[in-house]
């Protein structure tokens, strides 16, 4: 399929060589006109790698073809420093809003999309980020939400927390259903009931927390589909 979007690639931290892996890919909608909404896309990969195609670039092409400025985030792996992925996501949100005029986007309509562990990062951005870097809406595909051992995806938890995996304070901090507050954005959750990788309870817990805080939320659980379907 021919999409016809213009794509730009940028270093996220151009003045920090040690953070050179972090990049964003900006897909512009084919048609100009009024300022467009935007989405920051966080691929999954268990905080060990990144599914850049079906949970990144393929998504961006679709969203851009539907009128969004779509930004794929190639975030760094934690490698023992649990703050790294969220710092990259916050920086990306700042860059997007800071380029609103240049990229012809509406700085008040910047959402986040995340899949699996990328959904955990997107939900972290929605609940833990500084106010100025929080998204205006979130779309989470089969996200990791809780770090409770009975609910979580063990690989994502291990790779993010590393040696601090038994630190109760950090486990609670990254159990994001516990971090929802009145500033958490409206959220759409999409998942499969037969997901054997990330238990559907993760999304249910987050949806329940959003509902308790009277934040608009929708959850769509398909009867089959498994995990990691992205835009395949």
Task: Show which residues each predicted segment covers.
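Primarily recognizes the serine-hydrolase "nucleophile elbow" in alpha/beta-hydrolase
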Residues: 91-156, 171-172, 176
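C-terminal catalytic histidine-bearing segment of alpha/beta-hydrolase fold enzymes
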Residues: 25-27, 204-232
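Conserved alpha/beta-hydrolase "acid-adjacent" motif
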Residues: 196-205
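Active-site nucleophile elbow and catalytic-triad environment of alpha/beta-hydrolase enzymes
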Residues: 22, 164-179, 184-185
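Short beta-strand/loop motif that positions the catalytic acidic residue
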Residues: 183, 188-191, 195
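N-terminal cap/lid segment of alpha/beta-hydrolase-fold proteins
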Residues: 4-37, 82, 152, 181
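Short beta-strand element of the alpha/beta-hydrolase
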Residues: 35-45
